């Protein structure tokens, strides 16, 4: 079994600590105003180009599973995603602006594949906001990683 420490998930805990109440308030208001997307709704490493995106990027489906299993990060991601799913805003763009609306789609695509629970907020978010369509680039990166790991065996 993989431990949380194998992926340095503490980097997310540390980043969220001073802003998490602000995150909740902004999501509940339906309008993100401050800078926390990378460490609240992480996406696969390789999608973002900035050093911050690389630092907070999720390295693999295994790291995504460890994130969900983390006693603080998993429940926080679940809660934040549920708030977005039930938002009365007109679109992801209205909630997050650009490019964070695309980052959210990438995030929920990744985590919808990382959980065995078919009734999860990530799938609900894809259905509510993305017409059920996952982020294609996330799928490509995951498929490339899967093929690469098979070739190494």
Over which residues does each language-model region extend?
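Extreme N-terminal tail/first-helix region
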Residues: 1-21, 143-147
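Short amphipathic alpha-helical segments and their helix-coil junctions
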Residues: 13-26, 84-92
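Residue-level detector of well-ordered alpha-helical segments, enriched
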Residues: 32-39, 76, 100-107, 121-122
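C-terminal end-helix/capping segment
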Residues: 57-76, 129, 136-137
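Charged phosphate-binding loop/patch that engages nucleotide di/tri-phosphates or the phosphate backbone
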Residues: 117-153
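Hydrophobic/aromatic-rich, well-ordered segments within soluble, folded domains that form packed cores
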Residues: 26-61
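Short helix-capping/linker segments at secondary-structure and domain boundaries
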Residues: 46-52, 112-123
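Mid-chain, well-packed structural core segment of small domains
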Residues: 66-115
């Amino acid at each position: 079994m993989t431990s949380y420490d194998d992926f340095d998930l503490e980097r997310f805990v540390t980043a969220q600590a001073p802003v998490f109440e602000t995150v909740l308030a902004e999501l509940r208001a339906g309008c993100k105003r401050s800078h926390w997307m990378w460490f609240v709704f992480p996406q696969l490493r390789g999608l973002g180009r900035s050093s911050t995106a690389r630092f907070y990027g999720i390295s693999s489906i295994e790291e995504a599973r460890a994130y969900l299993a983390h006693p603080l990060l998993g429940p926080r991601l679940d809660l934040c995603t549920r708030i977005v799913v039930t938002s009365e805003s007109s679109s992801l763009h209205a909630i997050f602006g650009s490019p964070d609306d695309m980052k959210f789609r990438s995030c929920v695509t990744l985590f919808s594949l990382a959980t065995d629970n078919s009734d999860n907020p990530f799938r609900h978010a894809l259905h509510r906001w993305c017409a059920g369509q996952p982020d294609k680039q996330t799928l490509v990166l995951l498929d490339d990683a899967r093929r690469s790991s098979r070739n190494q065996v």
